[in-house]
């Protein structure tokens, strides 16, 4: 399968992309910079241009694959309502791109949704 992994240079996304590649899938990693593209190429992945901060940029890449695994987020641990809205919009755009194709969109989440915890 040809699979797009968003967040493929991050902790979870890199592990997912690596495992999919090891299983023989063609993995495309979302890249918003030259440095990220180089990191993806070094890992044996194909970089594809897109940015969660610009959800419309994700439509075309999502139409070119058999599945999407979304592990990216522009929100940080202390995300803002705006960053969470961009994340939501990005996933929605990819979902719309897949439409009624029957191709899966797998959405993951991170611990940031729980906010910042301190010991005590």
List the model feature ranges, each with a label.
Residues 15, 39, 79-81, 115-119:
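Short glycine-/acidic-enriched loop or helix-start segments at secondary-structure transitions
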Residues 6, 66-71, 107-108:
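Rossmann-fold scaffold of SDR-type NAD(P)-dependent oxidoreductases
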Residues 21, 41, 99:
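Anion (oxyanion) recognition and catalysis
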Residues 31-96:
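NAD(P)H-binding glycine-rich loop region in Rossmannoid oxidoreductase-like domains
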Residues 2, 26, 46, 104:
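Residues at the starts of beta-strands that form the adenosine-phosphate
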Residues 3-25:
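N-terminal Rossmann NAD(P)H-binding glycine-rich loop of SDR-like oxidoreductase domains
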Residues 23, 63-64, 100-101:
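Residue-level preference for short coil/turn positions at secondary-structure junctions
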Residues 28, 74, 89-120:
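Conserved Rossmann-fold NAD(P)-dependent oxidoreductase catalytic core, especially the SDR/UDP-sugar
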